[in-house]
Amino acid sequence: MFLNSFIKLIIIFSATSLLLGCKADSLEIKLSDKDIQSAIAGEAVAIDFEAEFSMLGELDDENKATLDQLLVLAEEFLSLDDFEIAKGDFGAKVFLEGSIPLTANPEEESPWYVSVSPYDSEFYIVQLKTGTKFDRLESAMSDINFLLSADPFHPIKYKLKAPGSTVIAPAVEIGGITHLY
C-alpha cells in the first residue's frame, strides 16, 4: 500500500515538473515604436522574444524524450531561432529565442502574438494575446502528455525603443531602476 502511494506521488511530482515547464519563468519581448506604427498600418511585423522555462527534478531519458517532442511541436507552431537546455540548481533550464507577430489583427493565427489596439484617440494598448492556433497547440501538448498544457499568460518584460514617445505603463525599468506608477 505504501509503495503504491509512493509511486503515485513520484508520478504526480514528475508530471508537475513538466507542467511547470509550460509557463515561462520569464518572457522578454523586444519592439520599437517603428514596429508598432508598421503593425497599425497593417504591415506584417515579427518581433524578437526570449523565453526561459524551468523544469524541476532530474532531466532523465523520459523527460528528455518529452522535451524533444515539445521542441518539434514548438518549431511547428512558433518561429524559433535558438533552443538551449542548461543544467540549473534545481533541474533543467530551457531557453527559447525566436520571433512572434506584432499585429493589429484580432484574428491572428499564431498561438501567441503581440496585439496593438487603439486605447483612445492618442494611445494604443500593446499586449500579449493568444491566437486561433493556441487551442491546437494545447491539444497537441496534451497528446504528448495528458498533464501538459500551454499557458496563455506569462510574466512579460517588454524592451521598447521609442525615443521621444509617450508611454503609459504600470511599472517600468529605466536604466536598471524600477519605477512603479
Residue ranges and their predicted role:
Residues 72-181:
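Mature, soluble, non-transmembrane domains
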Residues 24-35, 58-74, 78-80:
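Short N-terminal edge-element motif at the start of the domain
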Residues 20-21:
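C-terminal motif of bacterial Sec signal peptides marking the signal peptidase cleavage site
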Residues 44-73, 136-148, 152:
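Post-signal-peptide N-terminal segment of Sec-exported extracytoplasmic proteins
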Residues 1-10:
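Bacterial N-terminal signal peptides that target proteins for export
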Residues 30-51:
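Post-signal peptide N-terminal segment of mature Sec-exported envelope proteins
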